[in-house]
């Protein structure tokens, strides 16, 4: 029997001092009547943007054990949402969750958390950017910001890109995914 309350596996970090990640996702999903089921990637003292000396507890190994348990239970989710990843191995776990725990007809959403304002998040590496390009192929919907669009397409960060360039980038991404890009639309509006 199908659970009448929609369930979403939320694969993200838990930041102690922040208004982001699981701290935001759980109450937002809950307020929408969705059962948020966290699969934490890391525990951080603060969010990564704006703080240089944050602490990070990597939960890569725990993610594997949690997924093993969920699979033994036969859990299925109406949606799988992934955000901040602390390692490339975590991206493998996120793909595994999409592949093995997403109910037929469910929605896979990947927020490719890589950077902002033209800079990588301090914990990100070129290898993680390359792996994120692979992870987004598992998604139905991706939610990159402008910096992440540039990183995913291996294009130089150019906040002054002209309208034809921005449209071309969006077309390249939109061949495979639905992409709500508020930051890009604001940049495009400035060009109109």
What are these regions (language model features)?
Residues 123-192:
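Conserved phosphate/ATP/ADP-binding segment of small-molecule kinases
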Residues 2-110, 114-122:
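Conserved N-terminal subdomain of the carbohydrate kinase-like
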């Amino acid at each position: 029997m199908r659970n009448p309350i929609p369930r979403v596996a939320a694969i993200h970090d838990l930041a102690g001092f922040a208004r982001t990640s699981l701290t935001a996702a759980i109450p937002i999903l809950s307020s929408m009547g969705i059962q948020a089921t966290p699969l934490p990637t890391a525990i951080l003292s603060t969010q990564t943007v704006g703080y240089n000396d944050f602490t990070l507890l990597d939960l890569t190994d725990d993610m594997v054990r949690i997924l093993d348990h969920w699979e033994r239970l036969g859990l299925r989710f109406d949606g799988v949402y992934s955000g901040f990843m602390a390692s490339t191995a975590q991206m493998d776990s996120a793909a595994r969750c999409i592949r093995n725990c997403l109910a037929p007809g469910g929605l896979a959403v990947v927020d490719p958390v890589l950077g902002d304002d033209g800079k990588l998040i301090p914990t990100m590496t070129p290898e993680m950017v390359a792996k994120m390009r692979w992870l987004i192929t598992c998604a139905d919907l991706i939610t990159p910001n402008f910096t992440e669009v540039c990183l995913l397409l291996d294009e130089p960060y150019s906040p002054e890109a002209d309208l034809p360039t921005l449209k071309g980038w969006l077309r390249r991404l939109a061949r495979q995914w639905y992409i709500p890009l508020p930051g890009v639309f604001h940049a495009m509006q400035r060009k109109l």
